[in-house]
């Protein structure tokens, strides 16, 4: 998926997505998204999905790492709340 400059967090530490997110899979959608109420209040009502994929990120120490990311997405709202779940080799 093509991306502009996008940022996420590891706790309170920011990271930058570098390049595209690959191997995108839907984990949950609609009522299956546990924090749906929070997402609707914070970003707007729409059909929210939780997704995961593999991407390269730039960490605050400027190192590039390949990681598994999780995030939420809704049509017309976009991607929100990126989280690094696993560092890959």
Identify the meaning behind each predicted range.
Residues 7-89:
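Cysteine-centric segments in proteins
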Residues 1-5:
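Ser/Thr/Pro/Gly-rich low-complexity, intrinsically disordered segments
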């Amino acid at each position: 998926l093509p991306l502009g400059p996008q940022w996420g967090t590891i706790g309170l530490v920011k990271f930058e997505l570098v390049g595209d997110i690959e191997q995108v899979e839907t984990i949950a959608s609609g009522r299956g998204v546990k924090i749906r109420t929070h997402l609707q209040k914070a970003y707007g009502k729409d059909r929210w999905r939780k997704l995961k994929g593999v991407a390269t990120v730039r960490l605050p120490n400027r190192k590039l790492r390949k990681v598994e990311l999780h995030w939420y997405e809704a049509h017309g709202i976009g991607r929100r709340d990126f989280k690094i779940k696993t560092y890959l080799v």
